[in-house]
């Protein structure tokens, strides 16, 4: 994680003392293991898959995502700390132990978050989840309407572009929404999977069926080390799923520095990118 933070120049934010403190980041994923890197900052959990009332992750994907966003790095001496190590984390489990799920559970998760966003201080919604069925590729799909509703309610919604590249029109739903920040995967100058400094081949590409340019941003996502769901260890994963929480963490730092910057306007993804 340290080389990724260098790549995206987190040092400037850290020199200002920014850690994402006080910013709630909600995550729709496979759940969360209470790794010691999260300290006591997991402030909410809901399970739309199995209905359990305690935090768990039977896949590992969600825990890895949360570590990238806000792990403290406590168990690695700070080496694998997340982008916003002081932020609060809210997990809604919408995917099963194999990483599969239903759009109805994702929509239920979005509704759960919107009902509690004030109470839990949620400002950001991270969705490293996508559907690639042709029926879901319309801007009128339920998933797109769901993330648009979250954006209109004041959340910064950050969504993975998916791993169906390099062909065009391969952005997964709900990343095709013109409102949300859709994130692709770059190789961050390291010779992993592909060489050179460019979007990796598997990263989803636009335009969308509605001719919207996507992704809005790319971020490092190759061989990212983050929290494991097995004990207090770490593991390596790659994909746009890993790039997306890097952007979510960066937004948390931005909102800590400028907490009112989104209260009176509805910025486009382009506005957030410029910030």
Map each language-model feature to its residues.
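Protease zymogen maturation seam
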Residues: 1-24, 37, 136, 193, ...
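Subtilisin-like serine protease catalytic core
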Residues: 14-26, 32-44, 52-104, 120-123, ...
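Extracellular S/T/G-rich loop segment that most often corresponds to the catalytic His/Ser-adjacent loop
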Residues: 29, 175-256
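Catalytic metal-binding/acid-base residues of hydrolase active sites
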Residues: 31-33, 130-132, 162-166, 188, ...
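Short amphipathic alpha-helical face segments that pack within enzyme cores
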Residues: 64-68, 108, 245-253
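Structural detector of well-ordered beta-strand residues that form the stable sheet scaffold
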Residues: 90, 156-158, 182-183, 225
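Substrate-binding/access-modulating region of protease and related hydrolase catalytic domains
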Residues: 94-179, 209-212, 230-238, 242-243
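Single conserved hydrophobic/aromatic residue that forms the stacking wall/gate
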Residues: 264-275
């Amino acid at each position: 994680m340290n080389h990724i933070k260098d790549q995206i120049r987190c040092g400037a934010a850290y020199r200002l003392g920014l850690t994402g403190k006080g910013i709630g980041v909600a995550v729709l994923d496979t759940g969360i293991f209470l790794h010691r890197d999260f300290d006591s900052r997991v402030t909410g959990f809901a399970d739309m898959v199995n209905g359990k009332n305690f935090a768990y992750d039977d896949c590992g994907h969600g825990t890895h995502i949360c570590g990238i966003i806000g792990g403290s790095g406590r168990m690695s001496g700070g080496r694998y700390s997340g982008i916003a190590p002081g932020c609060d984390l809210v997990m809604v489990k919408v995917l099963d132990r194999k990483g599969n799920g239903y759009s109805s559970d994702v929509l239920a998760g979005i509704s759960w978050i919107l009902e509690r966003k004030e109470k839990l201080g949620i400002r950001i919604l991270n969705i490293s989840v996508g559907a690639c069925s042709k029926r879901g590729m319309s801007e009128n799909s339920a998933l797109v309407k769901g993330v648009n509703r979250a954006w209109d309610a004041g959340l910064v919604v950050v969504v993975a572009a998916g791993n169906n590249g390099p062909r065009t029109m391969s952005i997964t739903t709900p990343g095709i929404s013109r409102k949300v920040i859709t994130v692709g995967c770059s190789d961050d100058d390291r010779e992993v999977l592909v060489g050179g400094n460019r979007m990796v081949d598997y990263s989803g590409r636009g335009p969308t069926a509605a001719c919207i340019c996507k992704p809005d941003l790319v971020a490092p996502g190759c061989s990212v080390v983050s929290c494991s769901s097995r004990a207090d260890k770490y593991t390596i994963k790659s994909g746009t799923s890993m790039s997306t929480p890097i952007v979510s963490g960066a937004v948390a730092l931005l909102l800590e520095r400028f907490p009112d910057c989104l209260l009176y306007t509805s910025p486009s993804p382009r506005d957030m990118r410029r910030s």
